[in-house]
Every structure is written in structure tokens, then in C-alpha cells.
């Protein structure tokens, strides 16, 4: 077991605090431009690969991690199999079981393969759609405090774009907390 996996397990189980957490490594960044009717966002999608060790009860571990970092979990399920976005909330998807192909950015967007232990942070307006998934695929969805998600399946009107602009920047990264990558990467 490497140091990152060991320390990540310590953090995820609550044995270690956030200071010095190996989860603070740099996530992959996807910069998505408007695509057809999908508005997307100038803020990057953040993909944390293998950020949470895969252990029994991983969904509980993901929920505790997100809660600890100020992103209260709101559901466990999958990802819709239709293109959509949220205009009123940023969203974090913690992949708790299985594997899936997710298209980001709308039709003809970017397809990413996600596995249990990965995390994706989607800024408001980011198109996403499940292309395929294993039978055991499970996701924990969470949002910053006081953000209530909607589901948009059509082109953004001026009112929808204004709602997206008003969504606040989160105070912390759902994976690595206040000192994590998100507050540094999502600035304007």
C-alpha cells in the first residue's frame, strides 16, 4: 500500500485530520465551452481519480468526507441517462461502487470513465449524462450549503444564465476541504 492510499484511508475514516491530507493533490481539470444548447461553465470540472480508497461501505465513507468538508450529501443513486445540467447549484458526484462512462459538456462532449473511489465536481451549468454503467454503479450526490438543485434539459435562457452567475463559489473543496484545490481553481 502506498503512502497516498494509507493516508487517504486515515482521512476518510476520520482517523486523521485534513492537515497534510494526501487528498489535496491536484485534480484533473476539464475546461468545457458552451456546446449546442448546453451552457457549461468557464470554471473547470474537477476530476479526482482514486481519491478515496475502495473499502466496504464506501458510500458511507464518501458521505462522511463530503459532510466534513462542507458539502452535505443529498442522495444516493446513479447519473441520469439524459443530457442535463443544474443552473442553481454546483454538484459533487462521489462514485461509491462500480464503473460508468459519463459524457460531460453535452452531446458530442467529453466522455470520462469513472470508477469507485473517483470524485467529480461539476460547476453549475455543466452538462452531464450517463452513457453506460455497471450494474452495481452507485453515486453519492452533494451540494454546497443552501444550494438547491434543479434539472435543466433545454437551452439556457437569459434568466437561467443569470441564475448560474449568481451561484456562490463554495468555501471548500468536497474532497480536501478549505485548503483543497477548488477554492484555488474556481476564482472567477
Residue ranges and their predicted role:
Residues 131-188:
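Double-stranded beta-helix
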Residues 90-94, 112, 119:
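His/acidic/aromatic-lined binding-pocket segments of jelly-roll/cupin-type domains
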Residues 4-20:
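N-terminal export signals
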Residues 105-108:
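Short alpha-helix capping/helix-loop boundary micro-motifs
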Residues 114-133, 143:
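Conserved metal-binding segment of the jelly-roll/cupin
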Residues 87-101:
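Short, conserved beta-strand element in jelly-roll/cupin
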Residues 16-84, 178, 183-188:
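A short, N-terminal "cap"/entry segment at the start of jelly-roll beta-barrel domains
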